Amino acid sequence: MSLSNKLSVKDLDVSGKRVFIRVDFNVPLDGKTITNNQRIVAALPTIKYVLENKPKAVILASHLGRPNGEKVDKFSLAPVASELEKLLGKKVNFLDDCVGDNVEKAVNGGSDGEVFLLENLRFHIEEEGSQKKDGEKVKASGEDVKKFRQQLTNLADVYVNDAFGTAHRAHSSMVGLELPQKAAGFLMAKELEYFAKALENPVRPFLAILGGAKVSDKIQLIDNLLDKVDLLIVGGGMSFTFKKVLDNMPIGDSLFDEAGAKNVENLVAKAKKNNVKIVLPVDFITADKFDKDAKTSTATEDEGIPDNWMGLDAGPKSNELFAKTVAEAKTIVWNGPPGVFEFDNFAKGTKSLLDAAVKSAESGNTVIIGGGDTATVAKKYGVVDKLSHVSTGGGASLELLEGKELPGVVAISDKK
């Protein structure tokens, strides 16, 4: 799967055509009120670009929440239609389903770039391919899925995918439209461009920064990255498992991952073989309980963490060491914070690392933040625009970094 050779919306001739855009309008709702419209705003450049190029109609499709394959009013995309109308300054026709005769009739009657927003794709079991019933997974029949995909295909002449956050799912709207041209929207294209920069052709030294709790969740990630990077910072809860296994450091009540511990020595041996320098924290900010108001103390790697205490952040010496490592790198991918940044007393390590990452990006290096918690950190401190790229897809970016193919990306046409 090449990331750098995919058809882009800019390569399409959309004039007079029905353009189906798979967007990510999975926004947080309080009742019928959208509490954060960022995902809608993020899709505007692709929608506006298509509209400027004189299509017959633009058909927007998304999921919202987890309705589990049936119609659930609180997951309706109706509130999104009125928000989108405001943001676009153009009428948006909201349709109360995403497939079927009425939908086809409406869309085919569209002209002069009329905009249609389909109802939540996941109101149909065929979108995800299964639903949970009484705790059991029930699959949609192959026939029904095929029919649903054909009905979606009937709505369009060309297909654009701008939903990177769902790219790791082989859902019908991501992989099932059989059209001659399937292109990446601007959001998707930017994600692919930056991940290609890191994974296919990095400027070296290439550094990966990994945090998060469990080693066992990240084994495939570490294993894949050890074939690509020159430097690896392991921080967060995961670092205690490394410190205990490698240095026999006492870790008190800090996180210890029994399952992951079995792999630490293999991973370190692979790093040695591949000449990858692994950087671990050397001191810690500790707490007497997992709580924002916990008593705090410090510990060095030599003394270790006493019983009944736990490490919740990297200490000042580790922060210096991490900043120095960041300063050596020309390409950086960061997935997972080095401390419990949600609690102010344990956010210094994360803030310090973020400052170093911003400094690196400002001096012209490529700094990519994987989605999830690390993206939340970048937003919290208001530095999203100061970094090269903050991914919109936690799960999708993780799977890319693990070396997996993303079905939604594979489905996009390659440039001829």
From Swiss-Prot:
Annotated positions binding AMP: 213-214, 218, 237, 311, 342
Binding site for ATP: 213, 218, 237, 311, 342, 373-374
Binding-site list for Mg(2+): 213, 217, 373
Claim: Heme is one of the keywords in the record: no
Cellular-component GO terms for this entry: cytosol; mitochondrion
Subcellular location per the Swiss-Prot or TrEMBL entry: Cytoplasm; Mitochondrion
Positions of (2R)-3-phosphoglycerate binding: 23-26, 38-39, 62-63, 65-66, 121-122, 168-169
Entry EC number(s): 2.7.2.3
Protein's pathway: Carbohydrate degradation; glycolysis; pyruvate from D-glyceraldehyde 3-phosphate: step 2/5
Disulfide bonds: none
Assembly behavior: Monomer.
Family per similarity comment: Belongs to the phosphoglycerate kinase family.
Role, per record: Catalyzes one of the two ATP producing reactions in the glycolytic pathway via the reversible conversion of 1,3-diphosphoglycerate to 3-phosphoglycerate. Both L- and D- forms of purine and pyrimidine nucleotides can be used as substrates, but the activity is much lower on pyrimidines. Negatively regulates the biosynthesis of acetyl-CoA from pyruvate in the mitochondrion.
Protein name: Phosphoglycerate kinase
Upper classification of the organism: Eukaryota, Fungi, Dikarya, Ascomycota, Saccharomycotina
Gene that this polypeptide is encoded by: PGK1
